[in-house]
């Protein structure tokens, strides 16, 4: 049996989901980054390029210049080093893990603010979670893979 032509079809056209609306300018953006055992929560606020990491400046918290450069990399890639202030809470892991987690969190926040930055950050590998973890120690071995010295006789 067919429905009369003047009736509406049984399935209505569903509204098409819009792309995620960008965060309005001037509003802080919060994101999370993880690497190894480190978890970092970042608030990105329009400002002049300041860093507050657990209440300390970037130079105090990360005295290593390599880590400082790694952390600023997402802002340098999208050419906005002087545009945002970064406030972050860092927990767990060591300096290397925390620096990597902070880098990822900043990159995610930049994408949330402006989706046009995504291709550049993705190409630079800043939006990809580094899934490498410490391998567990096995019994009978000295470390994860290091075996005790073997003597044939």
Swiss-Prot record:
Residues 139-153 have a biased composition (Basic residues). Transmembrane segments: none annotated. Residues 129-138 have a biased composition (Basic and acidic residues). Residues 1-23, 121-153 are annotated as: Disordered. GO terms for cellular component: cytoplasm; small ribosomal subunit. GO terms for biological process: translation. One of its GO terms (molecular function) is structural constituent of ribosome. Gene3D superfamilies: 3.30.230.10. Residues 1-19 have a biased composition (Low complexity). PROSITE patterns: RIBOSOMAL_S9 (PS00360). The keyword Chloroplast does not apply. InterPro entries: Ribosomal_Su5_D2-typ_SF, Ribosomal_uS9, Ribosomal_uS9_bac/plastid, Ribosomal_uS9_CS, Ribsml_uS5_D2-typ_fold_subgr. It comes from the Bacteria. The keyword Ribosomal protein applies. Keywords: Ribonucleoprotein, Ribosomal protein. Belongs to the universal ribosomal protein uS9 family. PANTHER family: RIBOSOMAL PROTEIN S9, SMALL RIBOSOMAL SUBUNIT PROTEIN US9M. HAMAP family: Ribosomal_uS9_B (MF_00532_B). This is Small ribosomal subunit protein uS9. It comes from Saccharopolyspora erythraea (strain ATCC 11635 / DSM 40517 / JCM 4748 / NBRC 13426 / NCIMB 8594 / NRRL 2338). The gene is rpsI.
């Amino acid at each position: 049996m067919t429905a009369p032509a003047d009736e509406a079809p049984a399935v209505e056209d569903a509204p098409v989901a819009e792309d995620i609306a960008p965060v309005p300018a001037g509003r802080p953006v919060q994101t999370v980054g993880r690497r190894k055992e480190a978890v970092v929560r970042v608030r990105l606020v329009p400002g002049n390029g300041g860093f507050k990491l657990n209440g300390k400046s970037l130079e105090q918290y990360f005295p290593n210049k390599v880590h400082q450069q790694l952390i600023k990399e997402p802002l340098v890639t999208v050419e906005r080093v002087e545009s945002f202030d970064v406030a972050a809470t860092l927990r767990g892991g060591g300096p290397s893990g925390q620096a990597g987690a902070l880098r990822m969190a900043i990159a995610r926040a930049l994408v949330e603010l402006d989706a046009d930055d995504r291709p550049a950050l993705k190409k630079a590998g800043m939006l990809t979670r580094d899934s490498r973890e410490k391998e567990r120690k096995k019994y009978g071995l000295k470390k994860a893979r290091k075996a005790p010295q073997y003597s044939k006789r």
